[in-house]
Every structure is written in structure tokens, then in C-alpha cells.
């Protein structure tokens, strides 16, 4: 968006006056006034330089918001690391931010710079409803995400089985329906022009009941729910950490490291990646042909019994805490009275070892998933905190005005600043994902630089 073009369009619109038949309907501000003289636009509240500067800043904000959130959508839909069902919430949230940038912010900017509403009565109602809808949907999305985080922490196994893409999509539809119900009143309660105003205006219902109900439904009630849910998540996480520290004991007599609650011990690092479990399989067990060769040697009289037994130990010796496993292997491989190795015993030990390895692998995967859930919960907590910081000043001052009117009214420039800070929140989520989440950062680099390299090759 080039700021000179936008400024020129605004100047042309101001010279033309309100469009269509709505101009006369909106009072003396449209077409010709009551005395029959030509319509004169209101005196500009900003200089030409200020108009160009504001248009440039907001234009950059719009472009940055659209590009950043489009990257989020592409990353979630194309990256294997981000294809978890719960990330569909982020796609829907990014879509709401894109709609704010394309359907709300340009008209808010024009209304601010021109000092009157140029776009007609019908679009005024639609614009106000969309404004409230997208803001409300953002916070209701965050509320649904906080509940998703809570259930994934407190009911990890059961909830993860239930959290399918279909269920997540149904929840997203419910979020948009709830937001639409909350934002519907502006369609029927917006006001056209305050008494005594010379120019058409577009604003929300100024009655106290609407101001307070919209602030509570669109902001304060969801914020309260999010705060309570995340406080509960923090308590559960703190309790689990305390329980885990109590379960950890000193190293055992065989030097075994303390184990975690899922028996993995130190296999999982802080980055959520599991160290591969030690595979206690001897070199002679790696080949079925080798096992058959040894059994044949044992049948011929056990002449190589001692050598076979010498091969049963691993190259590095038994790992900590695996003495019982090694004992079972040695006993199973010791030939019976007739110099024969029990085939049933060998198979049972092999089955036991394979089951142990599968259990360790399953525990490792679960540990990695839990670490990823923990990082995701932290990132979303940052997103929610930033959202509240951006929108709280506006909703607090707006509700304060609804209670005590002029006695509590803020200076108009400060109120408008709070209003635009709320809009800025739509551009911040991609930045938060980039800073705090390695999967998003890697995916953004892959999307941007891979396509750029393709362009250079062409």
C-alpha cells in the first residue's frame, strides 16, 4: 500500500462527499445541506503530512499483518511438525487477523483521516459488526485454546485420543458462532449521527447497557475464563513437578540413574528429544544365520560352548540396571544337559527383549510429545498475555466511559491510541511464534528461502 495513493484517494473521497442515496438519508452532511448549498467536507483534523504519515504506518501494519498470518496458515498446513490437530486453532485465529487487516482496518483509517463516514449506512452496520466479530472471535479462540491446553495436561491420554481434526474443526465452528452471537447487536443498534452533528458518522450504540454488555461478552468474561484455566494448568504442572522430584531417589547400588515417572530416566533432554534406548543385542544375535550356526555347533557336542558363551556379552558390557536382562539371556543360551539350547527359552527371551524395546520406544515418543505440548502451552500463554495487554486499555476505558460518561472520559487522542493498539495485536502473533517456537521458525525459513532460491534458479 503506497501512502501517496491512499492519501490521494482519501482527498478525492472528501471532495466528492458521501456516496449514493445514503448521503441524504444521513442528514445535512450528504449531497446538499438544508439550505441547498453544495456539500462541503469537514475541515481536516490532520495536516497533509500527518495524513501521509498515518497512511504509511497503517498501510505497513496491514501488509505486515496479512503476510505474517498467511505464513502461519501455510506453515501449519504444509509443515509435518506443525500438522497436529490443535494447530488448526492457530489457522482460524490467523484467518481472523487477516480479516481484521483487510475488512476493518482500512475503513477505520479512512474514517479517522476524513473525520466522517463516507461509505454509507449499510456498510456502516456491516463494518461495525465485522469489527466486533473479529475481535471477539480472537479472544474466544484463545479461550478455546486454553481449555484445549487444560484438557491435554490433565487428561493427556484420553483427551489426545479424542482430539481429532474433526472435533477441532467442530470446536472452531462453535467459536465463530459464539462470536457472531455476541457481535450481532451492532447490526441493529448502531447509530447514524449524534444530534447536532453536521456530518455522517458511524459508531456503536452509545447506551450504557450495550457498552457494558459488549465489553463483558467480548473481553472481560473470556479473559476471566482464560485466567482461571491457566492458573489451574500452572497448579497441575507445579504439582506434577513436585511429585516427580519426590519420586526421584539417589542412584541405586548398581549405579543406575534415577528414573522419571514414566521409567525413561534421563533419556529425554530439555529440548524434548529422546536419546535412543540402548539396544542390548549382542553382535551374534544380529543375524539369524549366526544363531543357527551356533546352535549347530552346540549340537555337535558343545565343543565351542565356551566361545559361544564368551560372545554373549555386549561390547561395552551390560548397561546400568540391566543385570536381570543379561542374566535371563545368559541362562536362556546355556545349553541343557544334552548340549542343546532350548528353542522355546530362546524365543521367550527374544520376545521379552523386543517387548522391552517397544516399551522404551513408546515411552520415548510419549516424552517427546509431552515436551512439545509443554512448549506449545508456553507459546500460547505468551499469545494470550500479549492479547490482553493490547486490548485491555481500550476495553477498560470504554467500559469506564459507559459507567460514568464525561466524568471518566479519556482525552480523545489517548482513546484512539488505545483503539489502534488493539488492532496492532493482529500483527504480533506471527512474531511471537517466530521468537518462541522453533518449529514455526524453521517452517517460515523453509517457506521464504526455498521459494526465493527457486526464483533465482528460474
From Swiss-Prot:
<keyword id="KW-0297">G-protein coupled receptor</keyword>
<keyword id="KW-0472">Membrane</keyword>
<dbReference type="GO" id="GO:0070473">
    <property type="term" value="P:negative regulation of uterine smooth muscle contraction"/>
</dbReference>
<feature type="topological domain" description="Extracellular">
    <location>
        <begin position="404"/>
        <end position="416"/>
    </location>
</feature>
<dbReference type="Pfam" id="PF00001">
    <property type="entry name" value="7tm_1"/>
</dbReference>
<keyword id="KW-1133">Transmembrane helix</keyword>
<dbReference type="GO" id="GO:0051379">
    <property type="term" value="F:epinephrine binding"/>
</dbReference>
<dbReference type="InterPro" id="IPR017452">
    <property type="entry name" value="GPCR_Rhodpsn_7TM"/>
</dbReference>
<dbReference type="GO" id="GO:0045907">
    <property type="term" value="P:positive regulation of vasoconstriction"/>
</dbReference>
<dbReference type="GO" id="GO:0043679">
    <property type="term" value="C:axon terminus"/>
</dbReference>
<dbReference type="GO" id="GO:0043410">
    <property type="term" value="P:positive regulation of MAPK cascade"/>
</dbReference>
<feature type="site" description="Implicated in catechol agonist binding and receptor activation">
    <location>
        <position position="218"/>
    </location>
</feature>
<dbReference type="GO" id="GO:0004938">
    <property type="term" value="F:alpha2-adrenergic receptor activity"/>
</dbReference>
<comment type="function">
    <text>Alpha-2 adrenergic receptors mediate the catecholamine-induced inhibition of adenylate cyclase through the action of G proteins.</text>
</comment>
<feature type="topological domain" description="Extracellular">
    <location>
        <begin position="1"/>
        <end position="51"/>
    </location>
</feature>
<feature type="compositionally biased region" description="Basic residues">
    <location>
        <begin position="291"/>
        <end position="303"/>
    </location>
</feature>
<keyword id="KW-0325">Glycoprotein</keyword>
<keyword id="KW-1015">Disulfide bond</keyword>
<dbReference type="GO" id="GO:0042803">
    <property type="term" value="F:protein homodimerization activity"/>
</dbReference>
<feature type="topological domain" description="Cytoplasmic">
    <location>
        <begin position="148"/>
        <end position="168"/>
    </location>
</feature>
<feature type="topological domain" description="Extracellular">
    <location>
        <begin position="115"/>
        <end position="124"/>
    </location>
</feature>
<keyword id="KW-0675">Receptor</keyword>
<feature type="site" description="Implicated in ligand binding">
    <location>
        <position position="131"/>
    </location>
</feature>
<feature type="transmembrane region" description="Helical; Name=3">
    <location>
        <begin position="125"/>
        <end position="147"/>
    </location>
</feature>
<dbReference type="GO" id="GO:0004930">
    <property type="term" value="F:G protein-coupled receptor activity"/>
</dbReference>
<comment type="similarity">
    <text>Belongs to the G-protein coupled receptor 1 family. Adrenergic receptor subfamily. ADRA2C sub-subfamily.</text>
</comment>
<dbReference type="InterPro" id="IPR000735">
    <property type="entry name" value="ADRA2C_rcpt"/>
</dbReference>
<feature type="glycosylation site" description="N-linked (GlcNAc...) asparagine">
    <location>
        <position position="33"/>
    </location>
</feature>
<dbReference type="GO" id="GO:0098839">
    <property type="term" value="C:postsynaptic density membrane"/>
</dbReference>
<feature type="disulfide bond">
    <location>
        <begin position="124"/>
        <end position="202"/>
    </location>
</feature>
<feature type="glycosylation site" description="N-linked (GlcNAc...) asparagine">
    <location>
        <position position="19"/>
    </location>
</feature>
<dbReference type="GO" id="GO:0030168">
    <property type="term" value="P:platelet activation"/>
</dbReference>
<keyword id="KW-0812">Transmembrane</keyword>
<dbReference type="GO" id="GO:0046982">
    <property type="term" value="F:protein heterodimerization activity"/>
</dbReference>
<feature type="region of interest" description="Disordered">
    <location>
        <begin position="245"/>
        <end position="343"/>
    </location>
</feature>
<keyword id="KW-1003">Cell membrane</keyword>
<feature type="transmembrane region" description="Helical; Name=2">
    <location>
        <begin position="89"/>
        <end position="114"/>
    </location>
</feature>
<dbReference type="GO" id="GO:0007565">
    <property type="term" value="P:female pregnancy"/>
</dbReference>
<feature type="site" description="Implicated in catechol agonist binding and receptor activation">
    <location>
        <position position="214"/>
    </location>
</feature>
<dbReference type="GO" id="GO:0031694">
    <property type="term" value="F:alpha-2A adrenergic receptor binding"/>
</dbReference>
<dbReference type="GO" id="GO:0043025">
    <property type="term" value="C:neuronal cell body"/>
</dbReference>
<feature type="transmembrane region" description="Helical; Name=7">
    <location>
        <begin position="417"/>
        <end position="437"/>
    </location>
</feature>
